[in-house]
Amino acid sequence: MRCPFCGNVDTQVKDSRPAEDNVAIRRRRFCPACGGRFTTYERVQLRDLVVVKSSGRREDFDRTKLERSIRIAMQKRPIEPERIDQMISGIVRRLESMGDTDIPSKVIGEIVMETLARIDTVAYVRFASVYKNFQAADDFDKFVSELRPGLVEE
């Protein structure tokens, strides 16, 4: 594996262990050229997914992009980082097992929202505000009121 610090291709694995409930392998690596240490994760990839945007544009699925958007929604929430990793792995496995390699971005967004709703409602609302492109406070108000249908509006 290429060293991210100096580009040397001869790095050494110093430690390997299971991660994310045994669906990934965490490897600590060392670069003898520059002394750099870094961590890599190895995961099973069932198939190469392609995201189909609403504009029709297609791009390769990027787990890092999915992870970034979920971590932004989960920022400063009392959720363990391992739980977030498990959630992301679960979403990716679900996408890979759908049977088609072309996945509409809308489907990905809905799966993420469905998953977040079960884990943390604040993160769910945060993600939804970006995904559904909220423009005003009324958009938040309407969305949150739909979360609590039993409440009577004043």
Curated annotation (Swiss-Prot):
Cofactor: Zn(2+)
Entry GO MF terms: ATP binding; DNA binding; zinc ion binding
Cofactor note: Binds 1 zinc ion.
GO BP annotations, alphabetical order: negative regulation of DNA-templated transcription
Keyword Chloroplast: no
ATP-cone domain span: 49-139
Alphabetic keyword roster: ATP-binding, DNA-binding, Metal-binding, Nucleotide-binding, Repressor, Transcription, Transcription regulation, Zinc, Zinc-finger
InterPro entries: ATP-cone_dom, NrdR-like_N, RNR_NrdR-like
Domain of life from the UniProt record: Bacteria
Function: Negatively regulates transcription of bacterial ribonucleotide reductase nrd genes and operons by binding to NrdR-boxes.
Protein family per UniProt: Belongs to the NrdR family.
Protein name per the record: Transcriptional repressor NrdR
UniProt source species: Paracoccus denitrificans (strain Pd 1222)
Gene encoding the protein: nrdR
